[in-house]
Amino acid sequence: MFSEAKVTEIYCLADDFCKEFAKYQENHMLPTVHKSGKHRNKPNRMSDAEIMLIMILFHSGGYRCFKHFYLEYVCKHLAHLFPRRVSYNRFVELEKEVLFPMVIFIKTVLLETCTGISFVDSTLLRVCRNQRIHIHKTFEGLATRGKCSMGWFFGFKLHLIINDKGEILNFMFTSADVDDRQPLKQGSFLNNIKGKLCADK
């Protein structure tokens, strides 16, 4: 797990990014109108940067269950760093609101540098069991069927490039039916990759 100084450093990076991203959004997006026709500008109790930081800490900390991580680690051991924390259920609702800015934040701020030896591979992101494909609504029209070494699945693929230290250099999400070699044909996926790039067949 990160030291408190590292947590503060990541928060500062995320907060600076969120402020710039909010300015960009303000200039390029239409205002959100509530169903009643009124504009809603009620801010969340937690900032987007705090939500993003907690999500980054979870994925970096080796925890398997987010609920346990949030209730037992964030709410007890990091309570002094998150004085405006919300309930677990509310946090889960807020997570999806910061997904898009978080992906951009990771892509623009947190990616590491290439050392000359890189590895590329993909992993499946299953959204439901195969028996539930026909009643699945959340990713309807986005998720597709795909096949991997473990058989058929329904969802997406995550393509990752890492260096020899295990640090992430780039990533890309695709539908499940995309061939693993397809992202390598896109120049933007291989930006800043130099030297040897190893992959399985």
Where in the sequence are the language-model features?
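Short alpha-helical elements
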Residues: 1-201
